[in-house]
Amino acid sequence: MYPGILHEITPLNEHDFMYVADRHKEEFTYPIHCHEIMELNFVENAAGCRRIVGDSIEVIGDYDLVLITSSDLEHVWEQHECKSRDIHEVTIQFRLNLEEKNSPMRTNPFRSVYEMMMRARYGLSFSRQAIMKVYPRLMAISSQQEGFYAVQELFSILYELSKFDDACQLSSSSFAKVNVESES
């Protein structure tokens, strides 16, 4: 890890599968960081904010949805030129073992999700159409009191996102520190 990059200790303990933070804030203040677990981060009402994922630097529009599955991929959302005073952010942190050969994620029902998760090692940004498809689920997941149903909702979100072919890889392969493997 490079100097100045925070290694975040997430709120998940060894028996937790996921953690959801749904917050409204006036500005982005959290520093550039990375963490051991996967993250799906949704931001709305933050046009002009700067998103940095690895070596990708972009100014976002009103909606942003990014999936990061690499523990070494640093990322941050910065205030930059965002004028909004009511930024809405939903962060879903979760753990899945994609490396295990017998993982259910490698079976046919999960194939599209697995492939998307592998691409997300570089960070994936989703189109507005994909975001709008899962928007109601993103809004509902944080209020889900039953853990099982929240996990079910997360898998539904991931599956719906995996059906969109237009997700944009954010970081370059050299910067993302990812071993490129092929199953062909």
Language model segments and positions:
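A structure-centric signal for secondary-structure junctions around beta-strands
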Residues: I37, D86-H88, V151
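Alpha-helix N-cap/helix-initiation sites
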Residues: V59, F110, A150-V151
